């Protein structure tokens, strides 16, 4: 018998790209929120998912940079930082499914293979990219301080092309780090059929939310965001119409599994 949460499966499971659940995360999040054309968001949603109602801010978007450390329950990655650390940049919108309001990731890039495969298991549409973000410091002048006037920046590139860049100038402490990414995630997992006939071998609607969440003090400020064209990306279709604000916060959470809401959706 072979074991493993992902390929390659072996007798021991040690070669699997993904370690066993649960996964524990600690990281810093730089969030930029803005409004775009709701019809552009609608174009990114499956047929069984609808836009939020007009009074639920259907054009709201969160563009988030994250600098993560993540380990499995036995902490094996703590002694091997290359498997512990990764960065990602992702775009979150809100949507309605079965008369409930959800958050949903429509684009996401990561810089490690295990992070990409982990996302595919969870229904995140992860792709590989180059993700960079500035880190707050508490000593010296080699980085921004978490104080009024502190500037935090993030960049995203893929296939040698700059896709996005953001800057947040802090104003002061805040109660939260935005609102768009504050709901349970609704994702569609799928696997195209090997017959290449346009059908799927796997089609599921799933949801997930972290447990054992710990949050630092959030900071808010003024945000700037630029998106750039690429022949293989569609970020500019959801370009900002109105900037809402920027945020920084440290987050700790655990992913112990999700829930299948529907199989073979129409």
Regions found by a protein language model. Name each.
Residues 1-75, 218-222, 230, 237, ...:
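N-terminal domain-onset segments
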């Amino acid at each position: 018998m072979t074991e493993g949460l992902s390929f390659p499966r072996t007798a021991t499971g040690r070669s699997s790209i993904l370690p066993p659940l649960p996964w524990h995360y600690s990281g810093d999040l730089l969030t930029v929120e803005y409004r775009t054309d709701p019809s552009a968001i609608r174009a990114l949603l499956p047929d069984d998912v609808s836009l939020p109602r007009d009074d639920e801010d259907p054009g709201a978007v969160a563009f988030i940079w994250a600098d993560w450390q993540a380990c499995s329950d036995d902490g094996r990655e703590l002694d091997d930082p290359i498997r512990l650390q990764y960065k990602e940049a992702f775009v979150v919108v809100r949507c309605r499914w079965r008369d409930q309001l959800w958050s949903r990731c429509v684009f996401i890039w990561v810089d490690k293979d295990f992070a990409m495969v982990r996302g595919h298991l969870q229904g995140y549409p992860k792709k590989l990219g180059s993700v960079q973000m500035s880190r707050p410091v508490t000593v010296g002048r080699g980085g921004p301080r978490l104080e009024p006037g502190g500037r935090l920046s993030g960049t995203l590139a893929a296939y040698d092309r700059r896709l996005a860049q953001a800057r947040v100038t802090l104003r002061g402490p805040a109660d939260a780090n935005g609102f768009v990414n504050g709901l349970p995630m609704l994702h569609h997992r799928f696997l195209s059929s090997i017959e290449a006939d346009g059908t799927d071998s796997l089609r599921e609607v799933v949801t997930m939310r972290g447990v054992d969440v710990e949050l630092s003090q959030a900071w808010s400020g003024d945000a700037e965001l630029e998106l750039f064209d690429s022949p293989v990306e569609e970020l500019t279709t959801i370009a900002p119409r109105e900037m809402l604000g920027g945020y920084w916060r440290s987050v700790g959470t655990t992913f112990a599994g999700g829930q299948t809401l529907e199989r073979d959706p129409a």
